[in-house]
């Protein structure tokens, strides 16, 4: 807020765009201008918010510690604004919300009114500088395995993948990131390509199934290329994403505690052999195509400013 105070001495702001987390809504209140929420994740259903200790209706209320209390008092004293409740820093609201997915994909979408604009994801078309023998994937069945770039300690999981798909009649591409110890991952047969990083979009353009933790960016990428999932959620919003993909018959979900050679093999076989997963993915892709994208976002912001 101090930075905002300094900037507004020389700049007349028309509106503010902010993330679902943090102090964005307080900046809107301080400047007394329209606010646009930018949400790259699902909107959180009201019934889930009510289970959080930060929610004003929670049975057991979260209480700020002494230091936090002093900072909140200082904020109100110096800037004349304060959070409406303890939940606000985790769940900002705006006059309108731009959501980077489709209303069809959003869980409990009926709970969110017309001021929530589902403009669809932004899929990067840029080429990466990562070298990869894409020609080896042509005209082959391809399993792509990636658990993102942040998870560590996944060496046992990757070893299970090697045991499971050592006889797979096709190519297995496994991206292990740089937080896992390559020396703890066993030697794989020739049908495996293992690397810290791979050009994900190019791999997905050839893949038949994607084994993933279910991060939203990777999920959107795979839907764009019509690749169904075996999804193994770990944390954050991944369980919600996995549940929704399963409901829409675009993924087979495995709990990470239940992953072994048998369950992983059965899951991949199910996704590769059952047409419902390809149909489910195509419906999701169609819902993205029908979204208004950046043009709709610009139009609704202009409409907000003209009110």
What are these regions (language model features)?
Residues 1-63, 104:
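Conserved nucleotide-sugar donor-interacting segment of glycosyltransferase catalytic cores
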Residues 67-114:
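A short, active-site helix/loop in glycosyltransferases that binds the activated sugar's phosphate group
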Residues 10-12, 93, 139, 205-206:
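Alpha-helix C-terminal capping/helix-to-coil transition sites in glycosyltransferase folds
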Residues 19, 191, 197-243:
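A donor-sugar binding/catalytic signature common to diverse glycosyltransferases
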């Amino acid at each position: 807020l101090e930075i905002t105070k300094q900037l507004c001495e020389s700049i007349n702001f028309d509106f503010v765009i902010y993330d679902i987390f943090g102090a964005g809504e307080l900046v809107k209140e301080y400047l007394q201008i329209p606010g646009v929420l930018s949400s790259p994740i699902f909107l959180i259903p009201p019934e889930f918010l009510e289970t959080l200790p930060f929610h004003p209706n929670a049975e057991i209320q979260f209480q700020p510690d002494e230091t936090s209390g002093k900072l909140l008092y200082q904020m109100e004293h110096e800037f004349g604004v304060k959070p409406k409740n303890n939940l606000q820093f985790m769940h900002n609201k705006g006059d309108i919300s731009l959501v980077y997915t489709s209303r069809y994909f959003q869980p409990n979408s009926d709970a969110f009114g017309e001021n929530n604009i589902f403009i669809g994801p932004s899929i990067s078309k840029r080429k990466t500088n990562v070298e990869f023998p894409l020609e080896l994937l042509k005209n082959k069945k391809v399993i792509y395995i990636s658990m993102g770039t942040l998870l560590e300690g996944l060496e046992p999981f990757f070893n299970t993948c090697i045991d499971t798909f050592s006889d797979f009649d096709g190519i297995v591409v496994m991206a292990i990131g740089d937080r896992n110890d390559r020396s703890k991952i066993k030697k794989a047969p020739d049908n495996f390509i293992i690397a810290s990083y791979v050009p994900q979009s190019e791999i997905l353009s050839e893949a038949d199934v994607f084994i993933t933790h279910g991060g939203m960016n990777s999920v959107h990428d795979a839907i764009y290329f019509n690749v169904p999932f075996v999804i193994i959620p770990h944390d954050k919003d991944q369980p919600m994403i996995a549940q929704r993909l399963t409901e829409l018959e675009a993924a087979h979900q495995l709990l990470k505690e239940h992953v072994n050679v048998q369950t992983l093999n059965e899951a991949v076989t199910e996704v590769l052999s059952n047409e419902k997963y390809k149909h489910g993915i195509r419906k999701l892709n169609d819902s993205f195509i029908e979204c208004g994208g950046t043009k709709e976002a610009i139009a609704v912001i202009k409409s907000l400013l003209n009110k």
